[in-house]
Curated annotation (Swiss-Prot):
It comes from Mus musculus (Mouse). It comes from the Eukaryota. The modification Phosphoserine is found at S650. It holds the Pfam family LINES_N. Keywords: Phosphoprotein. The keyword Phosphoprotein applies. Residues 691-702 have a biased composition (Low complexity). The gene is Lins1. InterPro entries: Lines_C (IPR029415), LINES_N (IPR032794), Protein_Lines (IPR024875). Signal peptide: none annotated. This is Protein Lines homolog 1. GO terms for biological process: cognition. Residues 658-668 have a biased composition (Polar residues). The keyword Signal does not apply.
C-alpha cells in the first residue's frame, strides 16, 4: 500500500508540474478546468500530517502512461488506502506533503498573475478565471489559505499570504468589473478580529502584509478603476486601521511583550501608512485612515523608543515624503495629478503635521534620536563577521531629519500671522537643528558661517539638497515680504538678515556654497535644469528673482566669503571652537574690517547697509592667493554630459539622453572635496593686499577677465567672478540648445532672469 501511496503522490506532483508549466507560459487549458480542482485543493494531502489520497489504480496507470486518464478521479473509483495514517516514514512523507503544498500555492499564485496580466491571451485568461472562481466557490480557497497563514512553517505561511493577496486583488478587480461579486467576508472578519485584538500578534502582522501587498498592486495598476478598487478595500477597514494605529503608537514601549513582534508590526504598519497617504495623493480618496499620520502624529514618539535604528529611519523618511508630497512615487507609474483647485484639507493636515513635528523638535526630539554610524545591513543593525564597521553618522537619517525640520519650518512660516512670529520660529528651530547636526559633521561647521550646513549634510543627495535649499529660500522670501510691507522697519529687516545668516538660512550663502560644491561648473547646473525633476528649476528661478532685488546684499556676501578665505585660510574648513555657542537669538554680527585683520581672527559678514557707503565697484578681493587653474587641476576637471561647444555632438544628442543623465551627485562630492582640500594656509597669505573686485573697464559684465593677478591665473579673481562666469556659461549653453530645439521646455523666462543678472553686472 505504501508503494501505491508513493505512486499517487508522484502522479499528483507530475500533474501539478505540468499545470504549472502551462500556466507559466500562459497556455490555454485544453481539458475541462474542473478536473484540476482536485489537485489544487490545499486539503488534498492533509490527514493528520500524512498523505491519504483518494485514488484509483486505473487512473494511476493512465497518468503514468502519459497523462491519458482524466485529471480527477470519478466517484466510483475513490478508495481510501488502509493504514495510511500509520506512516513509518512520517518525516519523509511530511516533507513530500510540504513540497506538494508549495507547488499547489505556486500554481495558484501564477494562475492569478496571468488572470490579472494584460499580456495573457484572452481565451487562456478566461480559463484561468473560471478555474479560480470554481476554487473559491467549491473548496473555499480563501478560508483554507487563511488557515495556512498560521502555519509554523514560515515558507508555507508566506506563500499562503502571497496567494491570498493575489486572490483578494482578483476579487476586487472582478467586483468592479462585474458589479456584483463581493470581497471575501471571511477575510474581512479575520482581519478585523486580529487587528483589533493585538497590535503585535503574528496574525496582525500577516494581515498588514497582505493588505499592503493588495494596495501596492492597486497603485501599480494602470486601469481606470483603481480608485473604486481601493475604495472597496478600505471601506470595511477604515475604523479598524485607526483602532490599530492608536493601540500601536499610544502605548509605552515597556507595555509590549515581544520586541521582535513589535518590530515586525511597526515595519508593516509604517509601510501601510505610506501607501494610505500615497493613495490619498494619487487617487484622491478621502478616508479617515489616510489622515491618521497627519491628525495623530504621535507615531513620532517611537523615535525615542529603544527599537532598531532602521525602524526609526523608515519613519523619518516617511514623514519627509509626506511633507514633500512624494509618497508613492516609486509605485505609481504616473505622477500625481495636478490639482484643479487647492486641496485645503491636505494643506491643513500638512500644517498639523508640521506643527507637531516642530513642537517635538522643541522639546528635544532630535536629542533623543541616535544617529549611529552602523550600516543598515539590509534592514538590520548587526555587522556580519569579517565586515568592517564604518564610522560616522547615518547620513540617510541625518538628511531626512534635517529636511523635515526645514520643510516644517517653511510650512509654518507660510501660516504665521506676523514677521516677529516667523523670526522667533526660525531662531528656535534652526538652533535646535544646528545643535543636532554639530556633533555629526566633521570637520565642524564654520563658526562664522553656519549656512554651510546645508551643502555639507546633503552633499551626497542632490534631490534632498535642492528641496532643503528651496524651503530655506521660501522661508527667507516669506519674511522679507513682511518687512518690505513697512518702510519704517529697515533696522529690523537688517537684524532679520543677520539672523538668517546666524541660523544657517541666508540664501546667498546657501547658493554660493552650492556652487562651490559643484566647482562652479555650469554644465552641472544645466543637467539639473534639463532633468525631469523640476525642483532645481523652481529654486533657481526664485533665487534669480531675489538676486536682482538683493544685489547689494549678494555683493557683501561675496566680499565676506573672499575675506574669510583670504584671512583664515584653512581655518575655514578646520574645526574651530564656536563663539556662537550659548549666544542669544538676537545675534549681533561685527562689521567686516576695512583693513587686514589679526592673524588669529576671521572677518564677519558685512551687511548691505554697511556697504551702502562704499561704491559697489570697490568690493575688495585679495590680490595674492594660491595660483590654481580656473577649472581646478586638469586631472580633476569635471566632465560634461554633452560637449556643448561641439555643434555636431550637440545635434546628435536627444532630449531623452539629456534627461537620462541628469544627476551629478558623485561629481558634486568630488569637486567639493577638491575645493576643501586646497592647501591654502595663513603663511601663504600673510603678505597680501586688496584690490577692486571689478573694474569699470571690464570687457563684459558676464566675463571673468577683469582684474586677474599678474601670474594670469583665474582662481584668485574672487568668488563673485567665478559665480558670474558660471552663469554666463549657463546662459550660453541654454541659448545653443534652444537654437537647436534640444531644450526640453521653453527657457524664455529663465533666460530673461539671467539677462537681468547680466544687467546688474553692467552697473558694477
Amino acid at each position: 500500500m505504501r508503494y501505491i501511496l508513493d505512486i499517487k503522490m508522484e502522479i499528483v506532483q507530475e500533474i501539478l508540474d505540468q499545470l504549472y508549466r502551462k500556466v507559466l507560459l500562459g497556455t490555454t487549458l485544453e481539458d475541462d478546468v474542473h478536473g484540476y480542482i482536485f489537485y489544487l485543493n490545499p486539503d488534498l494531502s492533509e490527514q493528520d500530517g500524512c498523505p491519504a489520497f483518494p485514488v484509483a489504480q486505473s487512473n494511476a496507470s493512465g497518468v503514468l502512461d502519459g497523462m491519458a486518464g482524466q485529471h480527477g478521479p470519478s466517484s466510483h473509483e475513490v478508495a481510501t488506502l488502509p493504514g495510511a495514517q500509520e506512516c513509518p516514514k512520517r518525516q519523509l512523507q511530511m516533507d513530500r506533503t510540504r513540497e506538494m503544498k508549495l507547488l499547489q500555492l505556486t500554481v495558484i499564485d501564477t494562475m492569478l498573475s496571468q488572470v490579472l496580466s494584460d499580456e495573457t491571451e484572452t481565451h487562456a485568461k478566461e480559463g484561468y478565471r473560471e478555474l479560480t472562481e470554481v476554487l473559491l466557490q467549491s473548496v473555499e480557497l480563501d478560508s483554507k489559505l487563511m488557515r495556512m497563514l498560521q502555519n509554523s512553517d514560515k515558507l508555507l505561511s508566506h506563500m499562503a499570504a502571497k496567494c491570498l493577496a493575489s486572490l483578494l486583488y482578483f476579487q476586487l478587480r472582478e467586483k468592479v468589473r462585474s458589479q456584483h461579486k463581493m470581497l471575501s467576508n471571511s477575510w474581512v472578519t479575520f482581519c478585523q478580529k486580529h487587528l483589533s485584538e493585538s497590535s503585535e500578534s503574528g496574525e496582525a502582522v500577516r494581515c498588514l502584509w497582505i493588505l499592503t501587498a493588495v494596495i501596492k498592486e492597486i497603485l501599480k495598476d494602470t486601469h481606470s478603476q483603481r480608485a473604486e478598487s481601493l475604495k472597496q478595500l478600505l471601506t470595511p477597514f477604515d475604523i479598524t486601521f485607526e483602532v490599530f494605529y492608536n493601540s500601536l503608537f499610544s502605548q509605552h514601549f515597556g507595555d509590549f511583550q515581544s520586541p521582535s513582534n513589535l518590530a515586525s508590526s511597526l515595519m508593516c504598519f509604517l509601510e501601510l501608512l505610506e501607501l494610505l497617504v500615497a493613495s490619498r495623493i494619487h487617487l484622491k480618496l478621502h478616508f479617515r485612515s489616510q489622515r491618521m499620520l497627519f491628525l495623530k502624529p504621535h507615531a513620532l514618539d517611537i523615535l525615542a523608543w529603544p527599537i532598531p535604528a532602521f525602524i526609526k529611519r523608515k519613519l523619518v523618511i516617511l514623514v519627509k515624503k509626506c511633507l514633500l508630497c512624494k509618497v508613492g512615487e516609486d509605485l505609481c507609474r504616473e505622477p500625481a495629478p495636478s490639482l484643479m483647485s487647492p486641496d485645503h484639507l491636505l494643506d491643513s493636515d500638512m500644517l498639523t503635521l508640521a506643527d507637531t513635528l516642530l513642537h517635538a523638535v522643541h522639546v528635544g526630539l532630535w536629542k533623543a534620536l541616535a544617529v549611529s554610524g552602523k550600516p543598515s545591513c539590509f534592514g538590520g543593525d548587526e555587522v556580519q563577521p569579517g565586515c568592517r564597521l564604518r564610522t560616522g553618522p547615518d547620513h540617510v537619517t541625518l538628511r531626512a531629519a534635517s529636511l523635515i525640520t526645514v520643510k516644517s519650518l517653511e510650512i509654518k512660516s507660510q501660516n504665521c500671522t506676523s514677521a516677529a512670529e516667523m523670526k522667533v520660529a526660525l531662531q528656535t528651530f534652526m538652533s535646535e537643528l544646528l545643535a543636532f547636526l554639530k556633533p555629526h559633521l566633521q570637520p565642524s561647521l564654520q563658526p562664522h558661517n553656519p549656512c554651510e550646513w546645508l551643502s555639507r549634510v546633503f552633499i551626497e543627495q542632490d534631490d534632498d539638497m535642492l528641496e532643503a535649499a528651496k524651503a530655506s529660500l521660501s522661508i527667507y522670501l516669506q519674511l522679507t515680504r513682511e518687512w518690505d510691507a513697512s518702510a519704517s522697519l529697515t533696522q529690523e529687516k537688517e537684524a532679520w538678515i543677520r539672523s538668517t545668516h546666524g541660523h544657517g538660512c541666508n540664501p546667498h550663502c546657501v547658493f554660493l556654497f552650492f556652487l562651490k560644491n559643484v566647482a562652479f561648473d555650469s554644465t552641472v547646473l544645466l543637467d539639473f535644469l534639463i532633468s525631469s525633476e523640476t525642483c532645481f528649476l523652481e529654486y533657481f528661478v526664485k533665487y534669480l528673482k531675489l538676486l536682482q532685488k538683493d544685489w547689494a546684499h549678494f555683493l557683501s556676501i561675496c566680499k565676506f566669503f573672499a575675506a574669510v578665505e583670504s584671512q583664515c585660510g584653512m581655518l575655514v574648513h578646520d574645526p574651530v571652537p564656536s563663539p556662537a555657542r550659548g549666544r542669544s537669538t538676537s545675534l549681533t554680527v561685527p562689521h567686516a574690517p576695512a583693513s587686514p585683520v589679526g592673524e588669529n581672527t576671521c572677518p564677519w559678514l558685512p551687511w548691505a547697509s554697511d556697504a551702502s557707503s562704499e561704491s559697489q565697484s570697490q568690493v575688495m578681493m585679495p590680490k595674492e592667493t594660491l595660483p590654481v587653474p580656473a577649472n581646478g587641476p586638469p586631472s580633476r576637471t569635471p566632465q560634461s554630459l554633452v560637449d556643448y561647444d561641439s555643434s555636431e555632438a550637440s545635434e546628435e544628442e536627444t532630449t531623452s539622453e539629456h534627461l537620462a543623465n541628469s544627476k551629478q551627485t558623485s561629481l558634486c562630492q568630488e569637486r567639493s572635496e577638491e575645493i576643501q582640500g586646497l592647501p591654502r594656509t595663513w603663511e601663504e597669505q600673510k603678505e597680501h593686499s586688496l584690490e577692486p573686485l571689478l573694474s569699470a573697464e571690464s570687457s563684459s559684465p558676464f566675463s571673468a577677465k577683469g582684474r586677474v593677478a599678474a601670474d594670469g591665473t583665474v582662481w584668485q579673481v574672487g568668488l563673485f567672478l567665478r559665480t558670474v562666469k558660471c552663469l554666463e556659461e549657463l546662459q550660453g549653453a541654454i541659448y545653443r540648445l534652444q537654437e537647436k530645439n534640444l531644450f526640453p521646455y521653453n527657457p524664455a523666462a529663465l533666460l530673461k532672469l539671467l539677462k537681468g543678472v547680466e544687467a546688474k553686472c553692467v552697473n558694477v
